[in-house]
């Protein structure tokens, strides 16, 4: 099955995560090492981007198991 590019979807997942946090009144969220995570996807470290990438990869794997 051909899925959309992981980077493109990861950026969208990150946008949705930020929107969800903002809707809850959260304006800042930091990683375990103190990196601000509520910034544009392109501004994240590779380690922080991996959080979103891993989410997308897990969803893709789950879909593959269903088809």
What are the residue ranges of the model-derived segments?
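Alpha-helical propensity feature that highlights long, continuous alpha-helices across diverse contexts
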Residues: 1-67
């Amino acid at each position: 099955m051909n899925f959309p590019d992981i980077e493109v979807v990861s950026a969208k997942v990150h946008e949705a995560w930020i929107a969800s946090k903002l809707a809850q009144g959260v304006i800042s969220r930091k990683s375990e090492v103190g990196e601000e995570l509520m910034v544009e996807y392109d501004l994240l470290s590779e380690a922080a981007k991996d959080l979103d990438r891993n989410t997308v990869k897990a969803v893709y794997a789950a879909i593959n198991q269903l088809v």
